[in-house]
């Protein structure tokens, strides 16, 4: 089937300002949005800024908002749109714009550095460490994260209230805290970090982060809610409080 033109409405501009611009771009069968953006760069807009790397849905670089929804450009097929539909591509909203479709995501790296790394306890007497298979599988789900930061982008706590960024780590890094906190071999206590510095209390479990995750990680159900339960048990459970009073610990 020969390529047919599609209308691509792409954001052009930088931190000082910009606007959407329409382009007619040929799109062949099997193309994804990133293919069309590359075609646009090659034929009409060579200065269009766009971040990408693997084009296989594994690096998380090509995050954008496509028709208003945070998605990976390399995993969004053109045949999912209606014939004649205008496809709007804009930069992810939550982070400062650098230029065109590229944003400054350094906030995420700053939050990552605030989380203490994996800290294993002493080995068993025979020199090994053992884990139950269910514990292995639980943390494996969280490690599927490709750090596309779509969950960070869609989270209304920082999307609509950028002033919360200093005190809220966002779903990606709360999930990282949960992963380490649930690891049976880790001895570092991160519950106070989750409560006080990472801003777990800001999360009201709307599940928007789970809905946009390209790796289909159950961020809310398997990470955020269990982490909230652990924080509440540790800090507010009357039985835990009584036990501390009696034992002095």
Where are these regions (language model features)?
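Ferredoxin-type iron-sulfur electron-transfer modules in oxidoreductases and energy-metabolism complexes
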Residues: 31-43, 90-249
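Active-site phosphate-binding and catalytic loops of NTP-dependent enzymes
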Residues: 45-51
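Short, contiguous acidic and Ser/Thr-rich linear segments
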Residues: 20-32
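Eukaryote-biased recognition of intrinsically disordered, low-complexity regulatory segments
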Residues: 3-23
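Short, structured protein-protein interaction patches enriched in aromatics and acidic/basic residues
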Residues: 54-62
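Glycine-rich phosphate/adenylate-binding loop and adjacent beta-alpha elements
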Residues: 66-89
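Extracellular/mature segments of secreted proteins
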Residues: 62, 82-83, 211
């Amino acid at each position: 089937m020969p390529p047919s033109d599609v209308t691509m409405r792409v954001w052009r501009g930088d931190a000082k300002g910009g606007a959407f611009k329409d382009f007619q771009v040929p799109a062949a069968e099997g193309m994804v949005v990133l293919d069309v953006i590359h075609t646009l760069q090659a034929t009409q807009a060579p200065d269009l800024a766009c971040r990408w790397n693997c084009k296989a849905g594994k690096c998380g670089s090509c995050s954008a908002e496509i028709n208003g929804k945070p998605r990976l450009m390399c995993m969004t097929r053109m045949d999912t749109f209606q014939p004649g539909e205008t496809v709007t591509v804009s930069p992810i909203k939550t982070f400062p714009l650098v230029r065109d479709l590229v944003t400054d995501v350094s906030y995420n790296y700053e939050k990552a550095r605030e989380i203490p790394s994996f800290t294993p306890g002493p080995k068993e007497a025979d020199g090994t460490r053992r884990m139950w298979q269910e514990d292995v599988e639980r943390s494996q789900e969280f490690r599927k994260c490709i750090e596309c930061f779509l969950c960070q982008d869609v989270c209304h706590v920082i999307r609509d209230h950028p002033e919360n960024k200093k005190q809220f780590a966002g779903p990606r890094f709360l999930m990282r805290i949960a992963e380490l906190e649930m690891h049976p071999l880790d001895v570092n206590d991160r519950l106070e970090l989750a409560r006080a510095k990472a801003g777990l209390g800001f999360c009201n479990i709307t599940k928007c982060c789970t809905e946009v995750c390209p790796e289909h990680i159950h961020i809310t159900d398997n990470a955020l809610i269990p982490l909230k339960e652990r924080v509440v048990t540790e800090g507010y459970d009357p039985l835990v409080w009584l036990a501390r009073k009696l034992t002095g610990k």
